[in-house]
């Protein structure tokens, strides 16, 4: 039994193809709608699975080709994040057999596939499959790493992407002097479609590592949003996914920043001395930005692709507090009022300061001087 799956996002097609092949189906995939139509004519599948929203042509155009041009009754299943009633109605009027809204589970896709075309003769009915979720959007996550050989929680990362499709992790090795690069390359093995290792031979600091990673991931056409996250997972991937959900469901937001604001039910821990210094630094930051940010320094942020160049196009002045520079660049480019509408600060459910963090208390004091650098540099930029 042959299945053709058409979706412009490769991160959606990869787990879908893998699951259907595991079930015993013969599967071909295509990211371009026009080429998908050509493949339909040559492959002659028993089932077509297609997304509606694609850049070249709509998935409904694929349906029209099958039903109106080829006059074929080939079963068609639509997988889409589009919930527009008129679009769904048009799909069924054209003759689609099933419609599933993303996010959805591969288990359900498999069950509906069997209902539409039956099970392959070679299908192992006793086999149990993991319940991977196909997301509506595709997200790139940049994770800067410097000497993380002992601390990197490799299993936490792999477990998450194995269960949640639509994520592409980009680990940036920032000139580590230990075996971090070897650890990252081992992590990547077998998951090359979901994990990238970007190697910087020389240590340039976290700011430059994140910047290089963000610009690299911005070139990936199938990603909707791109963010960054600390390697120690002081903010975990589940909390990061909440930030993604916020930016996905609010068109006005271009940046959603995690915030370590202590609140009821949240697991937020900091050393008391570190907390006092953080409060002092935050007061200075609010004055520089003219914005009431509670926490700019949390290492968990998600961005719309259309603000990546403004935020990361130029090298940062400072090594650690580049987050402040990002927000300052946004306010200078869009204006303060517009920037306030674009930026969202979202409290985290969990944030724990991990042992072995590279930032010492002495370093924290140095940050005050770097804030002075930022204020001076971007005041000059504003005058130009």
Feature names for model-found ranges:
Residues 24-31, 39:
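Short hydrophobic/Thr-rich beta-strand motif most characteristic of the beta2 strand and flanking loop
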Residues 32-35, 58-62:
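Acidic catalytic/metal-coordinating carboxylates
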Residues 43-49, 54:
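Active-site beta3 strand of CheY-like receiver
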Residues 61, 83-98:
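Alpha4 helix (beta4-alpha4-beta5 surface) of REC/receiver domains from two-component response regulators
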Residues 86, 104-113:
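C-terminal output helix
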Residues 173-182, 233:
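A conserved acidic beta->alpha catalytic loop
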Residues 198-216, 225, 237-316, 320, ...:
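Acceptor/aglycone-binding surface of glycosyltransferases and processive sugar-polymer synthases
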């Amino acid at each position: 039994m042959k299945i053709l799956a058409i979706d412009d996002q490769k991160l959606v097609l990869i787990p879908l193809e893998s699951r259907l092949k595991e079930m015993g189906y013969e599967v071909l995939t295509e990211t371009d709608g026009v080429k998908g139509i050509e493949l339909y004519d040559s492959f002659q599948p028993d089932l077509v699975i297609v997304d509606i929203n694609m850049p070249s042509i709509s998935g409904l155009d694929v349906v029209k080709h099958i039903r109106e041009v080829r006059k074929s009754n080939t079963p068609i299943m639509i997988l889409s994040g589009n919930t527009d009633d008129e679009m769904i109605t048009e799909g069924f009027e054209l003759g689609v057999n099933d419609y599933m809204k993303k996010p959805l589970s591969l288990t359900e896709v498999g069950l509906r596939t069997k209902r539409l075309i039956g099970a392959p003769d070679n299908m192992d009915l006793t086999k149990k499959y993991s319940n991977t979720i196909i997301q509506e959007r595709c997200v790139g996550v940049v994770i800067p790493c410097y000497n993380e050989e002992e601390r990197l929680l490799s299993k936490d990362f792999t477990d998450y992407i194995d269960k949640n499709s639509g994520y592409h992790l980009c680990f940036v090795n920032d000139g580590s002097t230990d075996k971090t690069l070897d650890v990252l390359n081992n992590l990547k093995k077998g998951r090359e479609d979901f994990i990238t290792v970007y190697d910087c031979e020389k240590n340039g600091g976290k700011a430059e590592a994140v910047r290089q990673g963000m610009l690299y991931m911005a070139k990936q056409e199938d990603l909707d949003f791109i963010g960054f996250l600390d390697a120690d997972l002081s903010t975990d991937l589940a909390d990061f996914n909440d930030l993604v959900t916020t930016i996905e469901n609010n068109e006005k937001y271009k940046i959603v920043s995690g915030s370590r604001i202590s609140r009821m039910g949240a697991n937020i821990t900091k050393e008391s001395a570190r907390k006092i210094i953080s409060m002092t630094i935050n007061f200075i930051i609010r004055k520089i930005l003219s914005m009431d940010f509670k926490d700019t320094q949390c290492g968990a942020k998600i961005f719309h692709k259309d603000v990546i160049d403004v935020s990361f196009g130029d090298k940062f002045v400072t090594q650690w507090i580049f987050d402040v520079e990002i927000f300052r660049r946004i306010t200078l480019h869009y204006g303060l009022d517009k920037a306030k509408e674009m930026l969202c600060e979202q409290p985290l459910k969990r944030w724990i300061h991990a042992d072995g963090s590279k930032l010492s208390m002495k370093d924290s004091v140095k940050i005050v001087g770097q804030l002075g650098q930022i204020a001076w540099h971007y005041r000059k930029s504003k005058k130009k």
